[in-house]
């Protein structure tokens, strides 16, 4: 274990290749995956995400309402239906909520947004068309980017098929963890996953995938610390 600024690094693979053409990032929600990827985008890498087509698909849905918790404020132009049960909050259509808040804020502030994406992407698409549905689509995009001489970073690796694709294309996958040192050490060295948290399949898989990586960054510092660690690595 080494320490760099506010970022603890658990390195099980000293041979991590800084010149990989494709880098995947795995971690739980809000662990800093997108921030880590942005550090490379700022250096000229191309960002892709397995969930991008899913998000585009979800934005085309109409008539899908999500519960907006009390205290979350939407633009006055967004049509809302007030909760008449006395619990506070309101309901609005998914695409209006995402337009008003932006995708990342919507996922954090309105839990139904994340749940809808998980259900549509995993339970519906993967459940109906198989585990490689999103992988097959992404592989074509990655190969095209690589043929153009681009380096690709993918901050949303959630399934073993996605991990395997990156390895097959000559890439590496690293982990990003936000939490206490003890829980990370338990996971990395003793295969003990923390209790509680999101129980959806896509989140549960993150624990297994973190164990498959050879390199886990403990993101317990500032954004600048995380940027610095990514730039040092790649």
Give names to the regions the model predicted.
Residues 28-31:
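ATP-binding Walker
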Residues 25, 154:
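Hydrophobic anchor at the beta1->P-loop junction of P-loop NTPases
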Residues 26, 137-138, 160-168, 175-234:
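Small-molecule kinase domains that catalyze NTP-dependent phosphoryl transfer to phosphate-bearing small molecules
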Residues 41-48, 63-66:
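Post-Walker A helix-loop "phosphate-sensing" segment adjacent to the P-loop in P-loop NTPases
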Residues 17-23, 149-150:
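Pre-Walker A (Motif I) flank of P-loop NTPase domains
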Residues 3, 52-148:
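ATP-dependent small-molecule kinase phosphotransfer cores
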Residues 2-16:
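Pre-Walker A adenine-sensing motif
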Residues 34:
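Walker A/P-loop
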